[in-house]
């Protein structure tokens, strides 16, 4: 599959603390092969949360990183929103879920996708 990756400012700022360039490249290759691999996050309008191993801390997918992204199927785009360690955040609050949904709805309306 061909797709373009877009990063939010937050993701771009956080990513180097969790993944070096080679690790990020491996994540992108995996996501290109399986863009639906992340679990759908209820109440977010289609965001997905992908579990990813954390080589720096020797953690597998279960105890490793979480990557929040949105796959825009029609546009062949993967929008990278956030990355964090499982130990830092377990689940998003209902308010955070609503904020993600509002953000993606506004962006898709602007693009004419919703």
Model segments located where?
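Arg/Lys-rich, positively charged N-terminal/basic patches that mediate binding to nucleic acids
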Residues: 1-22
């Amino acid at each position: 599959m061909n797709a373009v990756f877009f990063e939010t400012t937050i993701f771009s700022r956080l990513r180097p603390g969790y993944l070096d360039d080679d690790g990020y490249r491996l994540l992108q290759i995996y996501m290109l092969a399986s863009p639906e691999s992340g679990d759908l996050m209820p109440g977010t309008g289609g965001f997905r949360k992908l579990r990813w191993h954390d080589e720096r801390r020797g953690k597998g997918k279960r105890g490793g990183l979480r990557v929040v992204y949105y796959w825009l199927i029609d546009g062949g785009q993967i929008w990278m929103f956030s990355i964090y360690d499982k130990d830092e955040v377990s689940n998003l609050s209902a308010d955070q879920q609503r904020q993600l949904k509002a953000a993606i709805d506004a962006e898709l309306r602007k693009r004419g996708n919703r």
